[in-house]
Amino acid sequence: MSEVRVKVKLTFPESEVRRAVLATLVRQFDVEPNIRRADVEEHRGWIVCEIDGEATQVEAALEWLRGERITVDLLGDVLES
């Protein structure tokens, strides 16, 4: 199993701003998000974070986010450790 780190920008629509999506990533996908920057307001929000974990789990977490109407933009390369 290979561990990876991806840097992403997550953009939340108004309907998803109040959800604890990073907590869900930890519990459901066994990945570790590390918030680098964020701007969350009542009607919109974004988070730049690194997500560490096993490659298949990180990809599953990103797909889940996309399915929840959260825009996922990859920032830079995927780093393997």
Model-based region annotation:
Residues 1-81:
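Long, contiguous binding/interaction regions
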